[in-house]
């Protein structure tokens, strides 16, 4: 068996989606049609959930840089810092959950769809399996409530959980060293990163 990423890198806002190009590459050769080729691989989506993303402040910083500088591009040093922070930084609890093989669902897809539409449908199928298997932490529930200014998920975290997460976000904001730091914008981006896994989980399990 082999493991392969669903996309090139993690989404900066934690709204991870399978890239159609990955599926096209997997289905490029073999017997039968696209569905047959993918079914031969017995694909089982794997969901990886992190309590904390050590690169969150770097991602938020990049969001503002791209907003303020239209042609902004990361340097090699930026990439190395992201890799180092991602590998060595604190992630809290990490959960791996393997979904069942998607062959049965693949077999129910309309094989006569134009290939672009078929790959979109397959990507959506994989995404739903991954999102439904996320482990949702208190960080996600608190972030969602803070972002949308509600108390919808208050039963999923304690007052101490909320206080700890707010303190964590404040600390990550302090690590951003932009000269024209837009704190409100950056805070919203940080909260969005932690709220999106819950948003996607709810959509996948309703």
What is the predicted role of each segment?
Residues 1-2, 9-206:
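Membrane-interfacial terminal anchoring regions of lipid-handling membrane enzymes
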């Amino acid at each position: 068996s082999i493991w392969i990423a669903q996309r090139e890198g993690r989404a900066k806002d934690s709204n991870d989606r399978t890239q159609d190009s990955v599926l096209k590459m997997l289905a490029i050769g073999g017997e039968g049609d696209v569905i047959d080729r993918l079914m031969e691989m017995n694909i089982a989506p794997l969901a990886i959930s992190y309590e904390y993303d050590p690169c969150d402040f770097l991602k938020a910083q990049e969001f503002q840089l791209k907003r303020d500088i239209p042609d902004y591009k990361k340097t090699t040093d930026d990439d190395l810092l992201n890799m180092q922070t991602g590998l060595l930084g604190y992630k809290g609890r990490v959960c791996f959950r393997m979904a069942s093989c998607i062959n049965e669902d693949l077999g129910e897809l309309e094989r006569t769809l134009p290939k672009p539409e078929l790959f979109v449908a397959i990507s959506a199928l994989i995404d739903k399996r991954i999102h439904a298997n996320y482990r949702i932490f208190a960080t996600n529930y608190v972030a969602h409530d803070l972002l949308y200014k509600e108390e919808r998920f208050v039963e999923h975290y304690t007052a101490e959980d909320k206080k700890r997460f707010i303190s964590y976000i404040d600390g990550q904001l302090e690590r951003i060293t932009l000269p024209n730091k837009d704190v409100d914008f950056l805070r919203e981006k940080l909260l969005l990163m932690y709220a999106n896994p819950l948003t996607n989980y709810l959509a996948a399990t309703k």
